[in-house]
Amino acid sequence: MNAATKLPGELGPIHFVGIGGIGMSGIAEVLMTLGYRVQGSDAKASKITDRLVSLGATFFEGQRAQNLGDAGVVVISSAIKKGNPELEEARRRGLPVVRRAEMLAELMRLRSNIAIAGTHGKTTTTTMVATLLDKGGFDPTVINGGVIHAYGSNARAGAGEWMVVEADESDGSFNRLPATIAIVTNIDPEHMEHWGSFDALRKGFYDFVTNIPFYGLAVCCTDHPEVQALVGRVTDRRIVTFGFNAQADVRAINLRYENGTAHFDVALQGEGEGHLIEGMTLPMPGDHNVSNALAAVAVARHLGMKKDEIREALAAFGGVNRRFTKVGEVGGVTIIDDYGHHPVEIAAVLRAARQAVKGRVIAVHQPHRYSRLHTLFDDFCTCFNEADVVAIAEVYAAGETPIAGASRDDLVAGLIAHGHRHARAILCEDDLERLVREQARPGDMVVCLGAGTISVWANNLPARLMGRAA
């Protein structure tokens, strides 16, 4: 590549509008470790912005035109709209305004890349790939959509050749990323406000896979019918498949769970008959998590990692924040915080909870966006079957206006109408505490699900239960 086409070493301060976002902060952190000057603003300070400041960033609380200072370039996410004072000031000055995905793509051009896409499982799979490459001595750079427990951050800058990134399909920008290895975990109808139709989303994933170079690799989960259909349409790129089905190149067999830990073997069918990695363990429950691990195994084998390295790395997997994260245990009741907000994710998490405990499962869900609840209403009414008790909180609007028939009470009524034996509404944290005190017994699990403020409730719950129990 001509050196002139690479990201220059000096750009002036790089200003991020919304630097505290999980997608923006990782890029900012990696840019700083590469020696760039970084500054940015957000509505309020957070653990994420505090970390960036500790690494050398300048942070502005609130968004004002004067925050730009002597910025040389401005980075925005798709959440930043026309009228934002910093965006308008950047345009008034004639500064380059760069979308988040475009800046990520520039960073990726400095490395060989593994990009992880899919409606669900991206963040966990990204973390698993990073974990295995760490163990294999690749020293990867990582930019993720969640905080990796082993790093205490959603990003790290490594000195190695490979970069591992979560590829976000929500606004179509994942097709701008120059992936060398492209992983697709699943494809479900989501983010229709951008794509408009499921066919357009399918085309987006097809483009994501076929954009890889001729020497690249697509790693695809053929347990999912949409991904299997995608594999059938891709005729001129190398593909490795993974899953539980008998045709997968990388296949999980002999799966069982003990105390929330998955034990299984991996048949490397693409390497020939009899190739196995025996005695694999993953310290978290859920068939969906085992499937995600298979994607990481496929990449690790492609890059030449030994079976023992793969086995040891996966056994030590530390997990991702808000992905089946245990936030406490009070009186024998385990409390879990999870980001799941799509019916497919919710059903998978509750199946994992059922595998992890002998007692009952109590699900607490805060729906995220009226539009999602409205579009997928029937799926929401049937995705809580593995929960003995379901409590539904008020919809987290995320800036949307209410939609008739898509409220908290509508969902509770829908759950009951579809046969759930114990569904109810809750209004506040006090209601959640009362529900747990009334329903939970030793050996039970409370699973708080959602992409909004439900995480705060989950993290506060252990102290509330202990404080008032004393």
Swiss-Prot record:
Q: State the pathway, as annotated in the record.
A: Cell wall biogenesis; peptidoglycan biosynthesis
Q: Which GO terms describe its molecular function?
A: ATP binding; UDP-N-acetylmuramate-L-alanine ligase activity
Pfam families in UniProt:
Mur_ligase, Mur_ligase_C, Mur_ligase_M
What's the protein here called?
UDP-N-acetylmuramate--L-alanine ligase
Q: Which residues bind ATP?
A: G118, T119, H120, G121, K122, T123, T124
Encoding gene per record: murC
List the record's Gene Ontology CC terms alphabetically. Answer: cytoplasm
Mainly localized where? cytoplasm
Under the heading InterPro entries, the entry gives: Mur-like_cat_sf (IPR036565), Mur_ligase_C (IPR004101), Mur_ligase_C_dom_sf (IPR036615), Mur_ligase_cen (IPR013221), Mur_ligase_N (IPR000713), MurCDEF_pg_biosynth (IPR050061), UDP-N-AcMur_Ala_ligase_MurC (IPR005758)
GO aspect biological process, one term: cell division
Q: Which family does it belong to?
A: Belongs to the MurCDEF family.
Q: What is its EC number?
A: 6.3.2.8
- Chain coiled-coil ranges: none
**Keywords attached to this entry:** ATP-binding, Cell cycle, Cell division, Cell shape, Cell wall biogenesis/degradation, Cytoplasm, Ligase, Nucleotide-binding, Peptidoglycan synthesis
Organism of provenance: Cereibacter sphaeroides (strain ATCC 17025 / ATH 2.4.3)
Q: What does this protein do?
A: Cell wall formation.
Cellular compartment(s): Cytoplasm
PANTHER family tied to this protein:
UDP-N-ACETYLMURAMATE--L-ALANINE LIGASE (PTHR43445:SF3), UDP-N-ACETYLMURAMATE--L-ALANINE LIGASE-RELATED (PTHR43445)
SUPFAM superfamilies reported in the protein's UniProt record: MurCD N-terminal domain, MurD-like peptide ligases, catalytic domain, MurD-like peptide ligases, peptide-binding domain
Could you tell me what reaction this enzyme catalyses?
UDP-N-acetyl-alpha-D-muramate + L-alanine + ATP = UDP-N-acetyl-alpha-D-muramoyl-L-alanine + ADP + phosphate + H(+)
The highest taxon in the source lineage is Bacteria
